């Protein structure tokens, strides 16, 4: 009795997942977001969506955030890593810009010195409203390792208002990406008038 080889029709390569799968739930990340759940249920029922202008503007704003780098130290390396293909922050609607007049978000990454503080404030003032600030890393959050130095500002929130703090020394690219997602959630919850 000879053994005959059997050929399976299953692919040799695992199929690529659609979106980033959350290991805890087995569903794509953001699938439990109440905003997207309500939109998909309304579209499934009627085929069109009824919303207010305020909600529409907030939805568009969260999907088209333009960020400006203010890399002052080693945290800037992780900030650059976030925009590379592995994490690809642009798929979340978060794209880099080179000019403060075209950007909505400033990421302060690194140690802010007393000499650099006026330049940071000047760049912040050039950004159009509504503008947001993400403080990235221990040095930007509170001075970090150089907290007791005479030339270091003990947190960039003493110079500009900060919306999201990302802790770490340096924080990973995943932590910064999570901070971006938190900022988008904060924008969705805040109206267009108040800020």
UniProtKB/Swiss-Prot annotation:
Location in the cell: Cell inner membrane
Keywords: 4Fe-4S, Cell inner membrane, Cell membrane, Iron, Iron-sulfur, Membrane, Metal-binding, NAD, Quinone, Translocase, Transport, Ubiquinone
Binding annotation for [4Fe-4S] cluster: 74-75, 139, 169
Topology versus the membrane: Peripheral membrane protein
SUPFAM superfamilies per record: HydA/Nqo6-like (SSF56770)
Single GO cellular component term: respiratory chain complex I
Superkingdom field: Bacteria
PROSITE patterns hit by this protein: COMPLEX1_20K (PS01150)
GO BP annotation list: aerobic respiration; electron transport coupled proton transport
Family label: Belongs to the complex I 20 kDa subunit family.
PANTHER family named among the record's database cross-references: NADH DEHYDROGENASE (PTHR11995), NADH DEHYDROGENASE [UBIQUINONE] IRON-SULFUR PROTEIN 7, MITOCHONDRIAL (PTHR11995:SF14)
Name of the protein described by the UniProt record: NADH-quinone oxidoreductase subunit B
């Amino acid at each position: 009795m000879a053994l005959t080889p059997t050929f399976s029709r299953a692919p040799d390569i695992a199929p690529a997942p659609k979106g980033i799968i959350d290991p805890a739930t087995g569903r794509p990340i953001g699938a439990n977001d109440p905003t997207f759940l309500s939109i998909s249920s309304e579209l499934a029922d009627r085929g069109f969506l009824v919303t207010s202008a305020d909600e529409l503007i907030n939805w568009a704003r969260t999907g088209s955030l333009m960020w400006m780098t203010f890399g002052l130290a080693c945290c800037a390396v992780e900030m650059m890593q976030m925009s590379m293909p592995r994490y690809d922050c642009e798929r979340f609607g978060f794209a880099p810009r080179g000019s403060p007049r075209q950007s909505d978000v400033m990421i302060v990454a690194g140690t802010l010195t007393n000499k650099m503080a006026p330049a940071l404030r000047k760049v912040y003032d050039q950004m159009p409203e509504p503008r947001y600030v993400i403080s990235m890393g221990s040095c930007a959050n509170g001075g970090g390792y150089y907290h007791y130095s005479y030339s270091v500002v003990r947190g960039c929130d003493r110079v500009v208002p900060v919306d999201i703090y990302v802790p770490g020394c340096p924080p990973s690219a995943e932590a910064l990406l999570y901070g971006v997602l938190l900022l988008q959630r904060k924008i969705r919850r805040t109206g267009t008038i108040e800020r």
